[in-house]
């Protein structure tokens, strides 16, 4: 008998007014996450493999929720195409996949899909998470898009680094 349930909790798409490489470099860098992710205070114990956010890189998310400190790992990184992380906290796994679709030289669609794997007994109680997660994830991505667009307006030659 299956003891866990995997649930999609969000599938959102946000337009970024920057090149896909710029959006990718910013969103995949763990050290930049607290700038745009509302629930994240900071990252700790960052261990990069190559560039920040490349497959195999890991860190701990220090969240605004007391005692929630998931260990994060990048499991897929294809620059300007796809980035995927998995966070583990106790019996819970959370996966986030970001897909990047260039819409021109300075325009990118970012699709974010989030899944939770939880003990089967917990799954029925996740209705609130499934209702709130898409709104929260879209808001975080809109914040990132706005920050990047403002940065480009201030200095059109500046990259996300």
Please place each PLM-identified region on the residue numbering:
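A generic beta-sheet turn/junction motif
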Residues: 16, 63-65, 78, 89-91, ...
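A short, structured loop/turn motif at beta-sheet edges
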Residues: 17-21, 75-80, 99-109
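A short, glycine/Asx- and small/polar-enriched loop/turn
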Residues: 51-57
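Short, surface-exposed coil-to-beta transition loops
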Residues: 9-11, 67-72, 92-97
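Beta-strand/loop substructures that line and gate deep hydrophobic ligand-binding cavities in soluble
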Residues: 86-139, 155-157
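Short beta-strand segments that buttress and anchor functional surface loops
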Residues: 57-64, 83-89
């Amino acid at each position: 008998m299956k003891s866990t349930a995997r649930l999609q909790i969000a599938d959102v798409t946000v337009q970024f007014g920057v090149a896909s490489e710029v959006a990718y470099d910013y969103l995949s860098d763990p050290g930049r996450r607290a700038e745009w992710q509302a629930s994240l205070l900071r990252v700790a114990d960052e261990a990069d493999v190559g560039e920040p956010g490349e497959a195999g890189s890991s860190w701990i998310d220090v969240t605004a929720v007391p005692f929630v400190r998931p260990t994060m790992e990048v499991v897929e990184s294809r620059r300007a195409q796809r980035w995927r992380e998995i966070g583990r906290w106790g019996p819970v796994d959370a996966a986030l996949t970001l897909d990047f679709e260039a819409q021109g030289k300075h325009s990118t669609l970012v699709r974010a899909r989030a899944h939770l794997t939880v003990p089967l007994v917990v799954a029925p109680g996740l209705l609130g998470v499934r209702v709130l997660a898409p709104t929260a994830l879209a808001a975080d991505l809109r914040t990132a898009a706005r920050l990047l667009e403002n940065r480009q307006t201030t200095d059109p030659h500046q990259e996300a680094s």
